[in-house]
Amino acid sequence: MASERGKVKHNWSSTSEGCPRKRSCLREPCDVAPSSRPAQRSASRSGGPSSPKRLKAQKEDDVACSRRLSWGSSRRRNNSSSSFSPHFLGPGVGGAASKGCLIRNTRGFLSSGGSPLRPANASLEEMASLEEEACSLKVDSKDSSHNSTNSEFAAEAEGQNDTIEEPNKVQKRKRDRLRDQGSTMIYLKAIQGILGKSMPKRKGEAATRAKPSAAEHPSHGEGPARSEGPAKTAEGAARSVTVTAAQKEKDATPEVSMEEDKTVPERSSFYDRRVVIDPQEKPSEEPLGDRRTVIDKCSPPLEFLDDSDSHLEIQKHKDREVVMEHPSSGSDWSDVEEISTVRFSQEEPVSLKPSAVPEPSSFTTDYVMYPPHLYSSPWCDYASYWTSSPKPSSYPSTGSSSNDAAQVGKSSRSRMSDYSPNSTGSVQNTSRDMEASEEGWSQNSRSFRFSRSSEEREVKEKRTFQEEMPPRPCGGHASSSLPKSHLEPSLEEGFIDTHCHLDMLYSKLSFQGTFTKFRKIYSSSFPKEFQGCISDFCDPRTLTDCLWEELLKEDLVWGAFGCHPHFARYYSESQERNLLQALRHPKAVAFGEMGLDYSYKCTTPVPEQHKVFERQLQLAVSLKKPLVIHCREADEDLLEIMKKFVPPDYKIHRHCFTGSYPVIEPLLKYFPNMSVGFTAVLTYSSAWEAREALRQIPLERIIVETDAPYFLPRQVPKSLCQYAHPGLALHTVREIARVKDQPLSLTLAALRENTSRLYSL
């Protein structure tokens, strides 16, 4: 028997690929009890008195060897391309090393403390049987992956196994092995429970730092503690790995994570174990790249990481976005509904029907929508909060209830059906010197700066907020304010002059320069609330001088293009081509002004006016551009023509209304999306009919305009401004607020909303 065992050992040593370390693995047992078996066999054979001494010396040698092999063998095993089974280590590239480990593991079942296994002084046949079975198992596994040299070992081992092994001992050995495995698992679980919670370690560094510690995570559960070796060896390996990882990772990073050897007792994945064992981790202690761990962890709603971990915070919030979307700005977001001076979307459903419907819900059809890139920001340097006019005492302070929120421009909707038809009356015409447009306009080329720095900002801000609160009666002052720091420019009160003639104004003042320069010159009369103007180019003959293009390059300037009835007699196909070309400009927001003028100042024949007016209506509707309508002493004919060519729900600006309410009422009824523009004529004491009409027209259907350079406000001395300009529209806004008995801030916001709805600004 001894000679056969020596032969087997010799063959194993010779096929270890010339590696003396692997060959020495057989001669260095890895535990005390297995290492005593050769000594016991020698003692039983010789019966000499030297057996106890030899046994003691061998034990001491084995104790020193066990710790060394627990790391060395696993390192060789991890570096090889071997495949391991759940219970037995399979063949590796280093055959001798794997065989040595297999014999060591098999012996471990006979010596694990705490298991009722065989005593160390078992009979020779039992010891031989155990070792031969190990050889047999090793040789059987090597048959599938190694050469014919390994087959020779298998034949010898099978012969020995057939001669010695007994069936009843095999069964008992299997039961002992299972018990030993169970105790090992329990012990390792205890180690994990104690050490796993006290060792911070990041998953990303686990594999790198565990390689020298024999803790690399294998694909099939490979690792030093995975082998069914003695409990002491497993304990030593586990303790070594944990201590090493703890020393290296204690000061490194957060994240309490399981180590690879903690997966020994179970086949559950490494990531699942992490989640189960460490469910109470802080959100900032996140493993890099482990999304499942991040998702499954519960964390407080506000946790700030450094920039390097920002993507992890984003990943966290994706799974909790229902609960904590916008966690850092939630209060600001909830306060939006309390802002009276918010900027509203043009898509808001508003009923403008004058029928007896106290709570209108929506327009008859959708608005005519335009691409957002057509518009530039109306606020650049004029974004500061409304401070020049005193707030009424009824204007709520910061923090008012949200029930009073978002009522801007809605207060008079309930009065939509209050007005009733009256007998038609004559239009009070205010004389305007439109012939000035035919005078010598400056045709000189003008130098303007082109600036669209805030064009994209307008696209973002255009639909900042959609008002969805129900309407309230006219008397209710349901507005509130916030400090400047809480308001964006788009949410602040301001106005846009919806109709002016910058080309005529520049000509009258002999001004050459940019609109920015013009505002600086007249800065004393341009209030902070000014947010832009729509310049109307109503003489197609002037579209060839390129002045309009230079003006539209300016911030806070938009354009409308059409043919005024005063110039309809000059209308031609070439002018129409120029007109349509100008309307293709991104900042061209309307078609007009156009219409009918039966006053003595208009020299164009009426039939010619009708023809040009009808042609422009058809073009405008085909282009889906809002209409800018001029009408003087021709209201009935105007309505009849518009009914033929304009849909009832079309967006219309009835420009510079100065007449009585019965004149405008039929248009308001037939065109629910029509808005009425009022100028500084309201400030004149003689314009009592216009003020009376203003009282009866709902605030939500009113817009402000200057019609500059005409209609200088009564309060403005000519020494300050000889002609009206867009900044002076604030005087008209104040008069509208006075006539409507509304706070100035609410009136400003309502007019701004109406402008946005009509022109999508």
From Swiss-Prot:
GO cellular component terms, A-Z:
nucleoplasm
Ligand binding (a divalent metal cation 1): 499, 501, 593, 707
The record lists a divalent metal cation 2 as bound by 593, 630, 655
Segments of this protein annotated with the region Disordered: 1-90, 135-181, 197-294, 318-337, 343-364, 388-486
Q: Compositional bias (Basic and acidic residues) spans?
A: 247-294, 452-470
Single GO MF descriptor: metal ion binding
Q: What is its main location?
A: nucleus
Question: What family does the database annotate?
Answer: Belongs to the metallo-dependent hydrolases superfamily. TatD-type hydrolase family.
User: Which keywords does this chain's UniProt record carry?
Assistant: Exonuclease, Hydrolase, Metal-binding, Nuclease, Nucleus
| Documented EC number(s) | 3.1.13.-
Q: Where along the chain is composition biased (Polar residues)?
A: 417-431
Species for this entry:
Homo sapiens (Human)
Entry protein name: 3'-5' RNA nuclease TATDN2
Under the heading CDD domains, the entry gives:
TatD_DNAse (cd01310)
Subcellular localization: Nucleus
Q: How changing residue 705 to A affects the protein?
A: Completely abrogates R-loop RNA exonuclease activity
- Impact of altering residue 593 to A? Completely abrogates R-loop RNA exonuclease activity. Decreases binding to R-loop
What enzyme category does the UniProt record give?
Answer: hydrolase
Q: Which PROSITE patterns does the record cross-reference, listed alphabetically? A: TATD_1, TATD_2, TATD_3
SUPFAM superfamilies linked to this entry: Metallo-dependent hydrolases
Q: How is the cofactor bound?
A: No activity in the presence of Ca(2+). Mild activity in the presence of Mn(2+).
Swiss-Prot/TrEMBL cofactor(s): Mg(2+)
Which residue ranges have biased composition labelled Low complexity?
Answer: 33-52, 66-85, 388-402
Q: What does this protein do?
A: Mg(2+)-dependent 3'RNA exonuclease and endonuclease that resolves R-loops via specific degradation of R-loop RNA stucture. Shows no activity against D-loop and minimal activity against the RNA strand of an RNA-DNA hybrid duplex oligomer. Has no 3' or 5' exonuclease activity, no uracil glycosylase activity, and no 5' flap endonuclease activity on DNA substrates. May have a role in maintaining genomic stability through its role in R-loop resolution.
Upper classification of the organism: Eukaryota, Metazoa, Chordata, Craniata, Vertebrata
